[in-house]
Amino acid sequence: MLENIKQTITRWDERNPWTNVYGLARSIIALSSLLTLLINHPSLIMKPASGISSYPACKMNLSLFCLGENNYMMLNLFRWVCIAILVLVVIGWRPRITGVLHWYVSYSLQSSLIVIDGGEQAAAVMTFLLLPITLTDPRKWHWSTRPIEGKRTLGKITAFISYFVIRIQVAVLYFHSTVAKLSQQEWVDGTAVYYFAQEKTIGFNGFFQALTKPIVTSPFVVIPTWGTLLVQIVIFAALFAPKKHWRLILIIAVFMHEIFAVMLGLISFSIIMAGILILYLTPIDSTIQFTYIRRLLWNKKHKKGEVSV
């Protein structure tokens, strides 16, 4: 056993966990929160709710939005502070610094916003689990693909352990979601999507109700209902699947969440889950080349050069 541990540590020491894979994931997660704050004024996302007379609720709460006076002018100021931090995260500046700030912003949003889709909760958990990776990341930009100089064995061990904990957490999340659904008769008999479509808060709008009515009101409704369960089971099983299957599972999983975004309006949640799934289903020590984007930028630059000549 000790020999296996030694071999694992040796393999980790030869690999690099600080790549643009986790950089892309945290940028996408931050982008979702950034869009939420840019689009919505505090008066829309921080207000009294059922059972809460004043908002944000700050009893035993360390949220950023609870550090000042409870009025919308102060809350709006804090909103812009969060926006500034999230912009730094999205562009990838100093993960070692912005990693902690990103978690605190995510925690503050999860604690203070009136949300119904669970995206902020997922972001708060994931940014916390990313802390051991960000705090040991020596790069100035999390997009950098340059080799890391120097021997950083302890930092690499810490980062890889955190990565595997994240993968287990994501797998458990989908496993728990599947089990919870299977405890409800609507999911077992295949009619759950029909009820979701009719739900007034996050149900289909008039366009999608008309578009999907032939399926949702027919026996074929079992296809999207059981299909959702099947995809979630596959995502959980990806924890044990060979890496060669990860990309296909990632495409299927992200596609499922984007359907949720379009049809149910779960845009914030779906963007956050896309970032989490990239982290879950892409080897952290690999490098995303962004070949198409580089080619596009190069062609534009080359064309400008031709014009100037």
UniProtKB/Swiss-Prot annotation:
<feature type="transmembrane region" description="Helical">
    <location>
        <begin position="113"/>
        <end position="133"/>
    </location>
</feature>
<protein>
    <recommendedName>
        <fullName>Uncharacterized protein YitO</fullName>
    </recommendedName>
</protein>
<keyword id="KW-1003">Cell membrane</keyword>
<feature type="transmembrane region" description="Helical">
    <location>
        <begin position="220"/>
        <end position="240"/>
    </location>
</feature>
<dbReference type="GO" id="GO:0005886">
    <property type="term" value="C:plasma membrane"/>
</dbReference>
<dbReference type="InterPro" id="IPR011020">
    <property type="entry name" value="HTTM-like"/>
</dbReference>
<dbReference type="InterPro" id="IPR023894">
    <property type="entry name" value="Sporulation_SdpB"/>
</dbReference>
<feature type="transmembrane region" description="Helical">
    <location>
        <begin position="259"/>
        <end position="279"/>
    </location>
</feature>
<feature type="transmembrane region" description="Helical">
    <location>
        <begin position="73"/>
        <end position="93"/>
    </location>
</feature>
<keyword id="KW-0812">Transmembrane</keyword>
<feature type="transmembrane region" description="Helical">
    <location>
        <begin position="28"/>
        <end position="48"/>
    </location>
</feature>
<keyword id="KW-0472">Membrane</keyword>
<keyword id="KW-1133">Transmembrane helix</keyword>
<dbReference type="InterPro" id="IPR052964">
    <property type="entry name" value="Sporulation_signal_mat"/>
</dbReference>
<feature type="transmembrane region" description="Helical">
    <location>
        <begin position="157"/>
        <end position="177"/>
    </location>
</feature>
